[in-house]
């Protein structure tokens, strides 16, 4: 696991990393630290113990007689240097690794973790290191390849459980291509946090396998444990996480739904004070707890025998290093002096000095937080900072100010730098490491990696048109954390690009098929712009609409009239109507249906959901189906017509409601069917509304490219209250580019505030703990907000409540609010006091790729089969629509399922054609309102409909 935090105060940072432990003093803690990274190598400190003054100087941006930072002025007008200190990347090993490394002091397992951390840092240097440089007066991001990292290894959690974790404190500096130190652009690290975490998991899993241990993947996120450790063993030594989960649960919040701020608050609230234990006492307590769960010396000996057997079977490798202190030397594969040539597997060359002296030289600390201890007050080191004791020369240029000096092989030059700043005279320093050529790197791609990349691309392209490359990397590594490496995935993506299977654009990927689908759609719509005759003669359109206005007794809005005129008079097969919510699209469609029918056309409608299709038909009189059902029926009709030798069809107009929900695949299918049926299509919707869950934004694309003739409906008529209408007008106002200006949201909230429509719940700060800066108790604040909101809702009369909604972005809020509302309704006797417990099924919304991968399944999931089949082993027939429960996964890569009659069958997920659900418990009483999530045609129940019990 990886967590990322900013280091806030450089002066207090070392104290935090030194002193936040239980049985080491300051010097002991420093003895077990290490500088790492190519940047550290340039400075000549790579592999050396961290020294207080050097650490402080680098955190404060003093490096090789340069002072990094921005010149600012304080309230007294005095200049000072403002420099962001750095980032703390905390790599935490799985609990089974911590038990082996800390409780039983297995140095091979510990080394696997340390190597994984260093390999991950090297990967960050290779792919996720950026800086900003000035190019012709413009600040631009630039790739770099080196970091200066301080490594601190700790071994306990705040709850005194074994927890192997390493703080990798990344200094805010990198040596750029111009041989100048500049600050990091750390967005790339934060943006790729999940991928970096997966790289660490992958490195660690493969390192453990390389020393002879098996690992068991626990979920689809790539989390794993050493094989043999039971969930009970892991839980016993995970008290810290249990504390946080219970703290959230006591407030009705699931940790999976809790935002980061609430998790942090729970961590602070449950954080215990440090307790005084010596190392021997603590380890003895650990062993006693472990023994009670079956983690005996015999249990551990069996695992260590695997390691010894693996080492004896490994090819002998002469070692040039005495690895008595594995923390300080590490393994040769992590040495930055070695050029990176790519690797396809983790080296299994591990020293096996079973009787070697390897005292535990790691320090203990709690979970990551920002440094808050006392500052260091020693002299600054001259080893790295050069002339840092002098007042730094600075330039107030709104960018990093530099005092430059030349360094060769990490040692400062004594001769002064030439004053001529000509770029032609700049001689790049010799780097003490070989710079990586990413293009020429040779990596052997395993078959498993190819499967993983295929899975990742299939998964993401089902719902996104252009996928950030980092998403593919992360998902592919999680596919098989034991075998798939970061570099192999990159190599496979490069291969697929060269073979024109995928397309890369600005760091994003898509498939050639999807890209071709977009291009075809654009060209097809353009080709059909003069392909049909007008529905109504152009000279008669205005007269006919005037007549309709007289019949209605009111005029159309400008948007309604323009849309109708465009549809009736256009020669294009495809027309777009881009209309905001509340602009009268229903009225426009009613008129369209009436006039088109008079002119011999059949109007048909389609919508994304059953409820939407039902409402479209009820409100406009246009017969409508879901998009999926419409396409099925149209395909069947066209096949029947083709079979019967052709039948004359009446002219048709297809209305696609809420077109922003149409995926690229569906969009192309609709175009194809319309062309074959010689039908016209009106795409109706708002391109800025919610998009399709599937890949692509075709409705927006064809408008932005100008190929779809589109009319606009932006005249708000839904809001009758002028104050609310003013607010809506501000929200939907567009900028010069024709897009809604999100910055107007502030103005909209100001208007609502002036109208006294915003009610803020203020919770007084409680407690005086300086460490928490007297921050509000977020749990108490949220609870009071919930109660106030429910109170306001319940004060409405029943009719008003039936037409009101409480909206929240968090699932945990939804559960709590529903509980509070139900409690109040029972007090009013609007709900029966007797609850009945029901199991409900919640769709996992797995993609097709996810449904076919066994790691995504968990016990007690429910599978609904989309087609019938017979189990070959048992002869049991599973009918289409049957629901079966997942019991377990077997060693053959199949799921063991159980049906309603308790029959067991084995099923391979790769066969697909299923829906996957998770079960949840719900309390339901007479008077409750439920929402249906699956259509049942035989009972005329539609997806999305609501019913009262």
Per-region residue spans from a language model:
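Interdomain "pre-motor" coupling segment immediately N-terminal to P-loop NTPase/helicase cores
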Residues: 478-540
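ATP-hydrolysis module of ASCE/P-loop NTPase motor domains
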Residues: 30, 116-124, 202-203, 234-237, ...
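Conserved helicase motor core of P-loop NTPases
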Residues: 520, 532, 536-537, 543-549, ...
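Intrinsically disordered, flexible peripheral segments
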Residues: 1-326, 330, 341, 405, ...
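Long, intrinsically disordered, low-complexity tracts enriched in Ser/Thr with interspersed Pro
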Residues: 317, 323-426
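N-terminal pre-P-loop "Q-motif" helix
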Residues: 553-571
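ASCE P-loop NTPase helicase motor core
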Residues: 472, 573-748
